[in-house]
């Protein structure tokens, strides 16, 4: 099965054909290769503040980036913004590309909070997630508002790929700990999230190789992320393993998947499980595209990326997506599950 047979656009096909799994390279060297994509100041307003992690979460300083929407500098000094807590992807081991958080901040007129959480294998499960949890709770209780411009009475959580795993696990962790902040999460948005470690799903078997993200590549990421197999039974490691009761009262959620992605089945299964728990959830599969289609710079101008971004920004902005879903031009591009 080849990428060409799925009607992928030229750029997506080039990504699939040029990408080679790097299973024999140290994670730190992979990070070096991505450094050119990390210029967070490029074309956007951002500030960075160091945040002190507790001893049990690394006992170190973590950089937290704050992305600001266009027009921020023209607003009064005391103007406050709603907040979005954004968790980047990268297979648990690579820093995220900054294109997506920039656009989300701009199109929602929000301050987007972007933690540089500890990456595996130096910070294995659950350290990165616990760092995000500590930061999130300190933002919500007012202990970390370094520029005094955040509204923290409610917040949305957004994550992509492995960051989507964290974005789904964080509310579950809050609920398990009986945190009052669980109820303050207004929405959860995840793009092609990792929700499980089952490598025999329909999408894993159908798109196991040749489609950018591979089955062997994901096994490699998981082996670096967890300390042992028993951790993979925990719902904050594999959210799909949460029971219906554990998912009750989960925040309103939008799950966006990519058709030719090994992760599409597990993301959609998680959405179905939320629905079975009577959670308000929408699951949208974007057809003819690959994993990473909204976050990769190369696919930014693709129809799939633009439709995916329009759908997700409407969701965060409380605008109906019916018109996009019903447009004739999009009927061959997306599937509502």
UniProtKB/Swiss-Prot annotation:
It comes from the Eukaryota. GO terms for cellular component: phagocytic vesicle. Coiled coil: none annotated. A motif (Involved in the stabilization of the negatively charged intermediate by the formation of the oxyanion hole) lies at residues 88-90. SUPFAM superfamilies: alpha/beta-Hydrolases. Belongs to the 'GDXG' lipolytic enzyme family. This is Vegetative-specific protein H5. It comes from Dictyostelium discoideum (Social amoeba).
């Amino acid at each position: 099965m080849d990428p060409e047979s799925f009607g992928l656009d030229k750029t997506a096909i080039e990504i699939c054909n040029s990408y080679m799994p790097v299973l024999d390279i140290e994670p730190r060297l992979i990070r070096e290769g991505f450094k050119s994509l990390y210029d967070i100041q490029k074309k956007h307003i951002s500030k960075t503040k160091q945040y002190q992690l507790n001893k049990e979460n690394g006992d170190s300083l973590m950089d937290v980036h704050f992305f600001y929407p266009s027009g921020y500098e023209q607003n009064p000094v005391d103007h406050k913004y709603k907040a979005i807590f954004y968790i980047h992807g990268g297979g648990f081991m690579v820093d995220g590309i900054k294109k997506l958080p920039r656009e989300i901040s701009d199109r929602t007129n929000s301050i987007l909070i972007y933690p540089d959480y500890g990456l595996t294998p130096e910070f294995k499960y659950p350290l990165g997630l616990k760092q995000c949890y500590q930061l999130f709770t300190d933002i919500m209780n007012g202990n970390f508002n370094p520029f005094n411009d955040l509204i923290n009475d409610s917040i949305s959580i957004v994550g992509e790929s492995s960051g989507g795993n964290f974005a789904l696990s964080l509310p579950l962790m809050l609920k398990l700990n009986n945190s009052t902040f669980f109820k303050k999460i207004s929405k959860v948005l995840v793009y092609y999230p990792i929700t499980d470690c089952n490598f025999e799903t329909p999408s894993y078997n159908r798109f196991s190789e040749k489609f950018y993200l591979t089955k062997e590549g994901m096994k490699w990421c998981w082996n670096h992320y967890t300390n042992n197999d028993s951790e993979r039974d925990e719902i904050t490691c594999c959210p799909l393993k949460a029971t219906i009761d554990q998912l009750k009262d989960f925040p309103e959620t939008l799950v966006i998947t990519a058709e030719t992605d090994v992760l599409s089945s597990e993301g959609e299964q998680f959405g179905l499980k939320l629905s079975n728990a009577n959670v308000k959830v929408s699951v949208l599969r974007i057809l003819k595209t690959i994993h990473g289609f909204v976050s990769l710079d190369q696919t930014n101008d693709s129809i799939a990326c633009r439709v995916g971004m329009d759908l997700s920004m409407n969701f965060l902005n409380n605008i109906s997506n019916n018109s996009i879903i019903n447009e004739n031009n999009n009927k061959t591009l997306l599937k509502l599950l």
